[in-house]
């Protein structure tokens, strides 16, 4: 995770107390503080994803690019990871294949097929039975809750 501080260090500069605090804060945010002494290779797939996110957070990014950040995570950690990312207060561009999670945690969505944008907008506008048919070739029914959760039934 300390490698996330590398862009902020000059050649041969040692990490500062602030660097260590930022790394510890990042580990705390992703729930990996208790495992910080373990080798990366000994971690599960989900734990590795959380460590990678912690490394990115240690960089203090203004924009965070995430490719399937919830892949291999248990449901609890999927929800926690996306809630954390949403609460960071920075711009995030994420690729998610779980449409229901994307709707719940995204302010704006792009649905793509073959590299082309098929639908875009706030989740309620972009995710429709018609757009899911166009992108995934499935029939569906969508019910929206007041807190922007999409309940998708595939028919």
Predicted regions, residues:
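Conserved ABC ATPase signature
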Residues: 13-14, 39-43, 47
């Amino acid at each position: 995770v300390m490698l996330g501080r590398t862009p902020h260090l000059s050649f041969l500069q040692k990490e500062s107390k602030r660097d260590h605090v930022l790394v510890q804060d990042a580990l705390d945010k992703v729930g990996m503080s208790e495992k910080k002494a373990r080798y990366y290779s000994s971690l599960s797939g989900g734990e590795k994803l959380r460590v990678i996110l912690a490394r990115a957070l240690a960089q203090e990014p203004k924009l965070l690019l995430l490719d399937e950040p919830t892949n291999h995570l248990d449901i609890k950690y999927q929800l926690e990871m996306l809630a954390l990312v949403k609460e960071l207060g920075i711009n995030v561009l994420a690729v998610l294949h779980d449409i229901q999670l994307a709707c719940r945690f995204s302010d704006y969505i792009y649905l793509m097929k073959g590299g082309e944008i098929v639908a875009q907008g706030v989740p309620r506008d972009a995710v429709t039975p018609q757009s899911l048919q166009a992108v995934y070739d499935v029939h569906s029914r969508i019910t929206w809750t007041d807190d922007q959760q999409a309940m998708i039934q595939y028919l």
